[in-house]
Amino acid sequence: MQRKILSVAAAVIFAVTATVTVYAESAEKLCYLENTDKSGIGVSAVSAILIEADTGTVLFSKNEKEHRQIASTTKIMTALLTLEAGEPDKEFEVDPTAIKVEGTSMGLREGDIVTRRALCYGMLLPSGNDAANASAVNISGSKSAFAVLMNKRAEEIGMTDTNFVTPSGLDADGQYSCAYDLALLTREAMNNKD
């Protein structure tokens, strides 16, 4: 259990200006320990949440419902939907319009043949905006249509303080989430066996 708590703490520290967290067996609402605000834990992030992985018990929280820009943590939802779309190992050619991106990329080029699984690696490891966009266009036909799917899935998970606009997380008007919702999302993603 201590190892899981340390893993969760590392994820929070790594991902947070907006925040992140762990998994559990279901995406039920999180339960809070008493006095989480008096834990004595010092965190420099504006928003943070630490959850025990198996139970979903909130061990620490700070401004966990405050809306924040969520940047590349958006790609957790994009990867989840990519894997849930099925056929993770089926090959396809990337749409050339999807791979012209700002910021980080996995290095996709016009004519590249990829799988959805490879795109998940590309969006989660080097934080490839091209991978996120290529997946979105492959699944939904456009980034905006994919954002509709992202918001529908967020609602199913119980993410009530989240709105997705882009699959990559590049700042866009109206795109935000909170530490609490990102914890729900991460718990859901960790349950995906692919």
Question: What residue ranges belong to the model's regions?
Answer:
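Sec-dependent N-terminal signal peptides of Gram-positive bacterial secreted proteins and lipoproteins
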Residues: Q2-A24
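Active-site-adjacent loops and short helices of periplasmic peptidoglycan-processing enzymes
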Residues: A24-Y180, R187-K193
